[in-house]
């Protein structure tokens, strides 16, 4: 099949766009002049890919998606900000992903092997890692960071500048306004949709090969942070002492990741 056969005749591809010869484009899709797409990427029908957008290899973009659109930020003044997407990502129908803003690094970034379901919104300047799952209608505001292997439940909403740590899980229909430490489950409580901590993501960690010792260590750190009468600073000190007393290197590694994340919080951690 030639490249002409892989691009539907009704698609509008700007002549300055850089597309690998193996890229497939569906009917009535529009691709702007500053777009680049790597080998094996497939785009459905009625999709718009615009802005300074780079898509890596073997990505799948669903129908009616909007990728690389202008940021929804009233300070935006047509600066040439970017969206950079890695390899092997699935971006389903009606998803909107915007470029960055000059007030941040100017880049919205998405890593590799992410599963982004229908009607997801990823706003300007977000940084999404690898192997994440965004369930349908998950919405993240500007400047949000999502770590590797994190899962966002359907219809969840995340406030701007919030961080979601690696291997964390956010429950469906939850409103998140503070950081979720790595390895932690956060979900809405009874009587409202504001997210609250609900323990370590034990099942997810087991599926990904974490050891019993690592999980036990994380549970102990979680109890110090959330289930004790310690202040935040006291809990951090106790977790640091726990790390110092841990001989197992893999356990020490995950505990250090947990401790470093909570120490770096600016919005506070979910409570």
From Swiss-Prot:
* Primary residence: cytoplasm
- Recorded metabolic or biological pathway in which this protein acts: Glycolipid biosynthesis; lipid IV(A) biosynthesis; lipid IV(A) from (3R)-3-hydroxytetradecanoyl-[acyl-carrier-protein] and UDP-N-acetyl-alpha-D-glucosamine: step 1/6
Catalytic activity line of the entry: a (3R)-hydroxyacyl-[ACP] + UDP-N-acetyl-alpha-D-glucosamine = a UDP-3-O-[(3R)-3-hydroxyacyl]-N-acetyl-alpha-D-glucosamine + holo-[ACP]
Record keywords, A-Z: Acyltransferase, Cytoplasm, Lipid A biosynthesis, Lipid biosynthesis, Lipid metabolism, Repeat, Transferase
Give the family from UniProt: Belongs to the transferase hexapeptide repeat family. LpxA subfamily.
Outline what the protein does. Answer: Involved in the biosynthesis of lipid A, a phosphorylated glycolipid that anchors the lipopolysaccharide to the outer membrane of the cell.
- Protein name in UniProt: Acyl-[acyl-carrier-protein]--UDP-N-acetylglucosamine O-acyltransferase
Per the record, the gene is lpxA
